[in-house]
A protein has these predicted regions:
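A short beta-strand-turn-helix
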Residues: 1-13, 36
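Loop/turn elements at helix/coil->beta-strand transitions in domains of secreted/extracellular proteins
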Residues: 8-13, 42-45, 70-73, 105
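Short pre-active-site segment immediately N-terminal to redox-active cysteine/selenocysteine motifs
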Residues: 11-13, 18-21, 53
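Stable alpha-helical elements in mature extracytoplasmic
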Residues: 28-31, 57, 117, 124
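Structural microenvironment flanking redox-active thiols in thiol-disulfide oxidoreductases
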Residues: 31-68, 81-87
Length: 129
C-alpha cells in the first residue's frame, strides 16, 4: 500500500478504497470510471483499492470487475493489519468505506464519505491538479 502514497512526480493520483459488498462504494464507482475516461492520456491515475475478503477474490471481485467492465486500475489490499495502514492513508480515517484520497506532489485531499456525484469528484481533482 505504501508505494501508492509515496509517488512524488507530476501525476495526480485518485485512490478509492471500496469493496463489492459495500453498496455506497459500488454506487460511486461510475464516477471514477468517468474520471478515468475523461483524463485518459493525461498525467492522472485512478486506482481502485478493493478491500474484498481474500476468499471472495475469484468468486466476487474478479466477476464484478469483468461484469462492470471496470477500466480503472484495480488493486487488492490483503494486509489484515488494518490499524497500521489506515493511519498511513489518513490519521483521521476510522476505517469505514468508501474513502477517497486525491493527491499530487504538492497537495492532498482526503474524502471520508461517499461522493454525492461526479461533479464533486471532478471538483476535488481540479483543486489538487
Amino acid at each position: 500500500l505504501a508505494p501508492i502514497f509515496e509517488k512524488q512526480n507530476d501525476t495526480t493520483y485518485v485512490i478509492n478504497f471500496w469493496a463489492t459488498w459495500c453498496k455506497p462504494c459500488v454506487e460511486e464507482l461510475p464516477y471514477f470510471e468517468q474520471l478515468h475516461e475523461r483524463f485518459a492520456g493525461e498525467k492522472m491515475r485512478v486506482i481502485l483499492v478493493s478491500l474484498d475478503f481474500e476468499r471472495d477474490l475469484e468468486t466476487k471481485l474478479t466477476q464484478f470487475v469483468e461484469q462492470n467492465q471496470l477500466k480503472s486500475e484495480v488493486k487488492v489490499l490483503l494486509d489484515g493489519n488494518y490499524n497500521e495502514w489506515i493511519d498511513k492513508v489518513d490519521p483521521d480515517w476510522g476505517g469505514a468505506i468508501p474513502v477517497t484520497v486525491v493527491y499530487s506532489a504538492a497537495k492532498r485531499q482526503f474524502i471520508g464519505q461517499q461522493l454525492a456525484n461526479y461533479e464533486e469528484l471532478e471538483s476535488v481533482v481540479a483543486a489538487i491538479r
